[in-house]
């Protein structure tokens, strides 16, 4: 099959727009129409919804089987069916599975592969053996192949796809010689999740299809439960152990718990093995229980059992069936009661059978068990011939038997081998093998029954009483494909007798050592006698030998009983009295009447025997023909499977080619991508090398740039210093202007007569004369000229940064509240470099004298010093060297500073002289006011303070205050003191 590409009517780009599967909850309806296997055996199918490309994809998947309720599961198992003829089509009852897939299970991203896995399981041997996986098939859910096409534009009420097809169950075993398992026909539908709709399924089977329907092998339309033992967790309870038991006759169920049933009544009860129309009947035989929980006060309960269904529990209806109450309180009751429960046929897939053990005294539930009815296997009577064994009782009284007895009946296909297994103490051949079921029930395989069991299918009777001569009056039904198959040379009916009190032992139902055993060989002669009996009412056998008479029967009859030797049994079997009716034939008259008929009956018997032999021969021939037909059908099915396998191989080859093409395209795209990335990597490496070379070339430039930046920072610091000095000069100019203003003030008119005229703030000469006003004007002009030259020099490329000699300042004004400190605060702020200090200028005179040693009248010259700091440390450099103009300006500036300092010294001396004169004048004035006259040439050395003490306010008024500028000039700065100390050291 060639690949045709995507749908031409719907582009691939619109696929995600039309169908957003990852955003929807989807339903997959998968119905198995028929199935066929290539080999005989018992098979089951397991269906699982998977998405292996997504981790944890099974979470959120819900599964609905037939019309049951949705359950959180992604896998389900059908019931077990038996393939008798290879190639024959079989059907399942659990055949419709609805998988609800959550959002994100199916996606359009190409990373999703949702499919349904169908596995074929083969069950051989006992029910405890693990199932063998012999075949599997994969059904793609989403995305789908081209055929059949999906309806990508479907609405919510429409199906994405719906069709019927076939799946081949391919070989799953590692054995290379194993062939394909078989195939199945299915019907599938895929759509958006819809609300569940109520539907009623037809559970009735047509007579033309006699199939086993569920997973529990029982008889007729009824199922039978045997001994029940409550499971024990922490409340001293045991697990439920049960095995197939005998079929009981329907018992009337009272509304309330009844008393102990009489097992000896109704020796020939009428049994009905057919269920009513459209209903299913479940027959439950409750034998006993052990380890029931006691009451809170430690008292023992009065137990009885209530049997109901889940619908009755939900609707709170009264129970249909319940057992009798024990005669006394006990934790290990024995009931032996049989009850019937009827349900609708369409509800078998949804109903559960609930067994509740109640306490009659406290009306409380002791234990409860739920058994799904869909796990049980149903027999239809029109499909099979059933063998019925009716056990009446013991003919003679027993000795040393104080307790009721139970009987285990089984039909073994080979009694010789069965006896050998019993001698070897094989657990499966001794007693009653029990199957322990844990609740809640996890798998229906616990209810499965093997097709052939060499130990037979044991069935348990009710306890028979009285103990001296027990009577059971109970029937046992055994399945057979036809009447003659259960009668052969080695087949035998085995009856084992056990005490019923064994269930109260430490190990419940430990039936290891029987009290006695009876064996009835089921040979073909016995079968012929059953067919030729009067009115076909069966063969009645009395005085059947019982083994171990020394422990079982009375001593009087023990010697006369035969042994279990088969030869002796064959000899005595001809002497067994056969009764064709319930009445006795001891009357001689009846014997005479029957003699003519016996001759005729013998003729009929011979004819019937011949017919039976002919029938057996024809059956053998029919079996041979069936085998040949089966072989032909298997060959035909093998050919069809091979054709299907070839078609599948072609499809697989096409899909593999498509995947290979896609992989090649991906490889090519990845190869181009790798080449592109390699080119990019080469370009990146080249660019990296260029950047490294550029970085290495820029290293010297970066170092030079850092040096220039350092120089620029130093220049900025020097500029800040110059600005700081300019501010100081401005302050000095303001002081000088104030002095000039004070000198130009008019002389007050109220001065005392004879007092010399003195300008405030103008120093006097040595003889009391005032200095010329032109001196201050000259200083102002000189300062203006110097400021103009500084502005010109600042505009040049290499700024001249000078540091002016700090003026002497009064220490009191350098404090926190000093005037000069406030004025200089902005010049020494955060912007001013902390590393720059003002060094005092060296004041000298011509001839090398210092300021202190200067000759009188010689002007003091102050030489400023320029400090420049670099990264290597502090060094002194004169930036004015090399240019004559700079030297001239520096000389002029130095001269101006020396002039300023000399004038300041003169002002200081004048202020001091004026203060002394003022003090003398004040003293003289006080003397004159007090009448103390002194000669004009007298000199006062010590002036008394009496007048001052008498009138301190007047003295304070007369005492003039020095200008603040004078005081400030007398105070040296801290920087001068610090740098002077450094120079001395």
UniProtKB/Swiss-Prot annotation:
GO terms for cellular component: peroxisome. GO terms for biological process: spermatogenesis. Residues 263-398 form the C2 domain. Residues 946-956, 972-985 have a biased composition (Polar residues). Residues 599-745, 885-928 form a coiled coil. Keywords: Coiled coil. Residues 228-263, 821-842, 931-985 are annotated as: Disordered. It comes from the Eukaryota. The keyword Coiled coil applies. It holds the Pfam family C2. This is Coiled-coil domain-containing protein 33.
